[in-house]
Curated annotation (Swiss-Prot):
Annotated protein name in UniProt: Methylenetetrahydrofolate--tRNA-(uracil-5-)-methyltransferase TrmFO
Positions bound to FAD: G11, G12, G13, L14, A15, G16
Organism: Oleidesulfovibrio alaskensis (strain ATCC BAA-1058 / DSM 17464 / G20)
Gene Ontology cellular-component terms listed: cytosol
Annotated SUPFAM superfamilies: FAD/NAD(P)-binding domain (SSF51905)
UniProt main location, coarse: cytoplasm
Length: 446
């Protein structure tokens, strides 16, 4: 095992920034390459690092949710993303939502201020780019929409064809364009909350909207790409095509959202989530889409209260690129045929911002240990971080990206009612993580 003194990281997203700080604080000289603002992916528009596409991208903060458990583990391990998220948090019920602009600006400031990190605004187009020569390790953390040239280089290196699916982004509208005579505030079973704005639908309005979604014109995909949808990012029109009531029993379910004007539960409810601290923008919850922009104007304005909606950002679709991790990556996330090149974040096959950040942090911990010739034991599969790591190591017939969920962990060794199982999984995860954490060298705990 060769000690590391220098590393290049390609990509200033959550995974790249997490990895960079871990390495820098271990005394490793880090050069962080970010192609923005000279070049942008289809999913990004800000020159800042750590750009999120949605204020609620960090998802649930409940201690018994899989992603909530992962966040707890990340906080214990000194996660940069968790620190910045807490500092830029906005009210969102049980979710960890942030002011996206403040979050990205804070991530950028953290990288620029960290001793040992040199930020270079330059696009890396190949694993053999001259700018990457001379480093002890190269980390590719270019995200799910890596540039075509870098993706081709990576495909050549792993010797396998990339797999593609589409992440669909929900529209954002201006708050002052919402008709408040039709919308009402409240979270499920918590009518006093002002984290969500709700647009109630009657039966006729729901079915007319659902029909418009099904018939709406969608953005075209490239001929050479096969379209696959990850369940967690299913476009709303794809859900609508599954059945007449799929939306009403899914993202538009009215449970716990009685209309205070009528005292009755609507047939369906479209929720709007605040996008920033000032509540000047709202995200249409569950309305991620690949409808053409003109169709978004027409169809989403069919929602009661949104007849005059002003779109701050339209929904869109972007490619997600990832490798078949069990086949092409070693346990330390290095390429099997290029052991000096490591992958981090969503390109490995973890799915989601929190998961990508955790993966980058974990890679940073493993590489930082090499500075002192140490080994860090793999986290137990019963905890969230270990379950994600095991997902990338476990050979399967058809490898697909995965969020953190308790289904990635072993079955419970006891019988339990369905409503109690999450709590038991979460408690087991905490116990196993605590035992593993005690084995870590002090340098790996911060």
């Amino acid at each position: 095992m060769t000690a590391l003194t220098s590393a290049a990281i390609v990509g200033g997203g959550l995974a790249g920034c997490e990895c960079a700080r871990k390495l820098a604080r271990a005394g490793i000289a880090v050069t962080l390459f970010e192609m923005k603002p000279h070049s942008f992916s289809p999913a990004h528009s800000s020159p800042e690092l750590g750009e999120l596409v949605c204020s609620n991208s960090l998802r649930s903060d409940e201690p018994e949710a899989g992603v909530g458990v992962l966040k707890q583990e990340m906080r214990a391990l000194g996660s940069l993303v968790m620190e910045v998220a807490e500092a830029t948090r906005v009210p969102a019920g049980k979710a960890l939502a942030v002011d996206r602009g403040l979050f990205a600006a804070s991530m950028t400031a953290a990288m620029e201020a960290e001793p040992g990190i040199t930020l270079i605004r330059r696009e890396i187009t190949s694993l053999d780019d001259p700018a990457l020569q001379g480093f002890d390790a190269v980390v590719i953390a270019a995200g799910p929409v890596a540039s075509e040239s870098l993706s081709r280089s990576l495909a050549d290196a792993v010797g396998a064809t990339h797999l593609y699916f589409y992440d669909a982004i929900a529209p954002i509208i201006s708050a002052d364009s919402v008709n408040m005579e039709k919308a009402f505030w409240g979270s499920r079973y918590r009518p006093e909350d002002t984290d969500y704005l709700n647009c109630p639908m009657n039966r006729e309005e729901y079915f007319a909207f659902r029909e418009a979604l099904v018939e709406g014109e969608k953005a075209a995909t490239k001929d050479f790409e096969k379209e696959l949808h990850f369940e967690g990012c299913m476009p709303i029109e794809a859900l609508a095509e599954r059945g007449e009531m799929t939306l009403a029993f899914g993202p538009f379910k009215p449970v716990g959202l009685d209309d205070p004007r009528t005292g009755r539960r609507p047939f369906a409810v479209v929720q709007l989530r605040t996008e920033n601290l000032n509540k000047t923008m709202f995200n249409l919850v569950g309305c991620q889409t690949k409808l053409k922009y003109g169709e978004q104007d027409r169809i989403f304005r069919m929602i009661p209260g949104l007849e005059d909606a002003e779109f701050v950002r339209y929904g869109s679709v972007h490619r997600n690129t990832y490798v078949n991790a069990p086949q092409v990556l070693n346990g330390d996330q290095s390429l099997k045929n290029r052991p000096d090149v490591f992958l981090a974040g969503q390109i490995t096959g973890v799915e989601g911002y929190v998961e990508s950040a955790a993966n980058g942090m974990w890679l940073g911990m493993m590489l930082a240990a090499r500075k002192h010739g140490e080994n860090i034991p793999q986290p137990p599969v019963e905890c969230a971080l270990g379950a994600l790591a095991a997902h990338l190591r476990t050979p399967v017939k058809k490898f697909q990206p995965s969020n953190i969920n308790f289904g990635l962990t072993p079955e419970l060794n006891q019988r339990a009612r369905k409503k109690d199982r999450k709590a038991l999984y979460a408690e087991r995860a905490r116990e196993n993580f605590t035992q593993w954490y005690a084995l870590l060298p002090a340098s790996a705990r911060s």
